[in-house]
UniProtKB/Swiss-Prot annotation:
Sections of the chain in a coiled coil: none
Pathway given in the UniProt record: Nucleotide-sugar biosynthesis; CMP-3-deoxy-D-manno-octulosonate biosynthesis; CMP-3-deoxy-D-manno-octulosonate from 3-deoxy-D-manno-octulosonate and CTP: step 1/1; Bacterial outer membrane biogenesis; lipopolysaccharide biosynthesis
GO-annotated molecular function: 3-deoxy-manno-octulosonate cytidylyltransferase activity
PANTHER family in the record: 3-DEOXY-MANNO-OCTULOSONATE CYTIDYLYLTRANSFERASE, 3-DEOXY-MANNO-OCTULOSONATE CYTIDYLYLTRANSFERASE, MITOCHONDRIAL
Protein family according to the UniProt entry: Belongs to the KdsB family.
Originating organism: Chloroherpeton thalassium (strain ATCC 35110 / GB-78)
InterPro entries: Cytidylyl_trans, KdsB, Nucleotide-diphossugar_trans
Location of this chain's protein in the cell: Cytoplasm
Protein name: 3-deoxy-manno-octulosonate cytidylyltransferase
A single BP term in Gene Ontology: CMP-keto-3-deoxy-D-manno-octulosonic acid biosynthetic process
Domain of life: Bacteria
Gene from which this protein is expressed: kdsB
Length: 246
């Protein structure tokens, strides 16, 4: 089985302008993400899927493999699907371009289920929510997930799930980590499906898979990463990276 990591990277970003090119100790943020992904033991290769010639040229100047994709694609998943057409891969892993500290072990944990199950269409990562702080459970930016007994997703929501009507019950509550792995046919199928009702309601594209009967294996991880969405996130990453590079 051949697994390839594809990292979607857009030059334009709203909260942190051109964040993919922000300097992190002499290298652009997206290059740091690429280098972390290269440390995966189970992936055969890594490819950047970029939306501009400028980003392509900069990535290649640092030795990154990259492919230019149309600027107007609707989502990161559409971008990796476009890039995946040109690569030889059985499984395609979507690692976000703004994850310069992502542990390679997180990536490998999403690949492993495909080795164990040749029919698996899709996998993603989830993490236990160990705090009952309302600011976490009620935060719509923290996506919650419930699974069946075999670890397959039943539903993803921005609302707290499951709703705890029985105060004696002690359900495990999980948050979704936005790293996906697709068997290539499932990825191709996803991009041909129209946006679904639940997807548009919650603004969560993974619900398109569930509504169309495509199962998602949820892998529990206790590892952490730090995405860069804001200036505060960037400051955290710079501080962590400075310690690592000492």
């Amino acid at each position: 089985m051949k697994a390839v990591i594809v990292i979607p990277a857009r030059l334009k970003s709203t909260r942190l302008p051109e964040k993919m090119l922000v300097d992190l100790d002499g290298k652009p943020l997206v290059v740091r993400t690429y280098e972390q992904a290269k440390k995966s033991r189970l992936a055969s290769d890594v490819l950047l899927a970029v939306d501009s010639k400028r980003l392509l040229d900069i990535a290649e100047s640092f030795g990154c493999k990259a492919v230019l994709t149309p600027e107007n694609l609707q989502s990161g998943t559409d971008r990796i699907a476009f890039a995946a057409k040109s690569i030889d891969a059985d499984v395609v892993i979507n690692v976000q371009g703004d994850e310069p500290l992502i542990p390679p072990e997180m990536i490998d944990s999403a690949i492993l289920p495909f080795i164990e199950n040749a029919a698996l269409p899709c996998a993603t990562l989830i993490q236990p929510i160990v705090s009952d702080v309302p600011e976490i459970l009620q935060n719509p930016n923290v996506v919650k997930v419930v699974t069946d007994k075999n670890g397959y997703a039943l539903y993803f929501s921005r609302s707290p799930i499951p709703y705890q009507r029985n105060s004696d019950a002690q359900p495990k509550i999980f948050r979704h980590i936005g790293l996906y792995a697709f068997r290539k046919p499932a990825l191709e199928t996803f991009t041909t499906l129209p946006p679904s009702m639940l997807e548009e309601t919650e603004r969560l594209e993974q619900l398109r898979l569930l509504e169309n009967g495509i199962r998602i294996k949820c892998v529990i991880t206790n590892l952490d990463s730090q995405a860069v969405d804001t200036a505060d996130d960037l400051a955290k990453v710079k501080a962590i990276l400075a310690k690592k590079l000492k």
